[in-house]
Each structure stands twice: as structure tokens, then as C-alpha cells.
Amino acid sequence: MTPWVLRTRYQKLVITGATNVKVYRKHIRNKDAFVFLGYVESKELEFLHKNAYAFVFPSLNEGFGYPPVQSMRYGVPVAASGTTSIPEVCGDAVLYFDPYSVSEIKNRMVQLLDTEIYDEYAARAPKRYVEVHTRQIADLEEAVNFILKV
């Protein structure tokens, strides 16, 4: 489950991912502030990455941590879980939180409403994307060269 905050005049928290949304809707006080999309196809996912005000990634079990990097490509600031591989992949371009702490997640989201913090992480985001992407290309070239030599 991934929350998105779209760049609109009245921001909404957009949540994607295959999940039982009825459980969440039942406990939400301000239902108009949330949009549950469930699973989305890659084109819609790309639209969300590109048009988000911020990307919040409370993952507990991420193998590589690529979703935050996808948002960084577009200069979208990210708040993400400080667990698994995410800090290794995202470096200092992300505001980290404990994914088990609702108050930490909320505090990071509120921090991104501060213009200075927002601008700082919006500037870091595409730089980190380029670093990760460049490293991936170099690793792929190395693997291809190794295979071709065998």
C-alpha cells in the first residue's frame, strides 16, 4: 500500500496497492481527503509519480526500494521507511521514518509541507535518481561484459 499526495489545490492522499480498502475506509474520519486506487497499471503509476506533491513509502518488506527512486526522477520529495534496503538505495535524499510509528509518518508528511524542507528534498531527489540510474547502468554493462567474455 503506497500513499501519494497529488499536486492539486486541495490535496488528497492517494493510496495505491492491492489491499482491502473497506477496512481503511471504515476507520477514516475525513473520507474526502483520501482516494483509494488499489492496484494501478504502469502508465497510471507513472502519472502518479510525475504529478505527486510528495511520495510516502511506509514499506516493511522492500527488496530494492525502487518506488521512491521512481518519484525522485521527477523531483518529487520522498518520505520513506528507514528499514530494509531503502536507506541504502535512497541515501540522504529522503526523510526517513519508522514504518511502525504512525506519529513519525505523520510528522514527516507535515515536514514536507514546510517550503524550505520541501524545496531541499525536491532538489535532492533528481540528483539521487541520476546516481542510482547511473550505477544501475554501470552494473548492467559490467554483467553483460562478463557474460560476453565467458
Annotate each PLM feature.
Residues 1-150:
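Carbohydrate transferase catalytic cores enriched for Leloir-type hexosyltransferases
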